[in-house]
Amino acid sequence: MAVETSHDAELTWSLVLPVKPLARAKTRMAEAAGPLRQALALAVAADTVAAALRCAAVAEVIVVTDDPLAAAELSALGARVVPDEPDCGLNPALAHGAALARAARPRAGVGAMSADLPALRPAELGRALAAAAGFAESFVADAQGVGTTLYAVRPGVPFSPAFGPGSRARHAAQGARELAIEGLDSLRRDVDTPGDLRAALALGTGPRTAALAARMPAFSPGAETSRG
């Protein structure tokens, strides 16, 4: 079971976000996005990072990526960009970013968050992090109830992310507390498929994602109806 801790309303957080090389990102969007697929992947990541940086509880956003274009744009937004080490998968990359975060801010909590949350609201992220401050290890499930969009640990707690297919069950099995809080729709709405993006657009995405989607016929008003 998750260990409940004394609640620290003043706890700040370092967030680690992984960003794939754009050439390999959003492949399930290839048909809908066409030649704008890579630009869409970058827009989604940029809107996610920008929203996270506006959250008052977030002291730092660390982006783990080897993509030079993504690195330049996300660094310009204010994120700290580090290379993907040891370059052997998602969870090791997150652990690398978390180690750097703890070296810089040992008294901050550390979270790993999806970079695919273009509708993210800073206030919703803040509510989740405030709840996470009350537990040693916690997570937020995705909108499908199968994956994870946020995994968080308090200072000094081992950082053991288990992202990937079925991560909700894995995080729960290792003792992390699921933060089943109402009103976290934007934090739970990750985007991997055209249907996911339509759901995010309905919530209201950041400006970069909205602008790219407006250029794609698949996401124009009435497109869903026209497919019958």
UniProtKB/Swiss-Prot annotation:
Gene3D superfamilies: Spore Coat Polysaccharide Biosynthesis Protein SpsA, Chain A
Molecular function via GO: GTP binding; phospholactate guanylyltransferase activity
Stored InterPro entries: CofC, Nucleotide-diphossugar_trans
Pathway: Cofactor biosynthesis; coenzyme F420 biosynthesis
Binding site for phosphoenolpyruvate: T148, G164, S167
Domain of life: Bacteria
Assigned protein family: Belongs to the CofC family.
Role played: Guanylyltransferase that catalyzes the activation of phosphoenolpyruvate (PEP) as enolpyruvoyl-2-diphospho-5'-guanosine, via the condensation of PEP with GTP. It is involved in the biosynthesis of coenzyme F420, a hydride carrier cofactor.
Name by which UniProt lists this protein: Phosphoenolpyruvate guanylyltransferase
Protein's organism: Thermomonospora curvata (strain ATCC 19995 / DSM 43183 / JCM 3096 / KCTC 9072 / NBRC 15933 / NCIMB 10081 / Henssen B9)
Gene from which this protein is expressed: fbiD
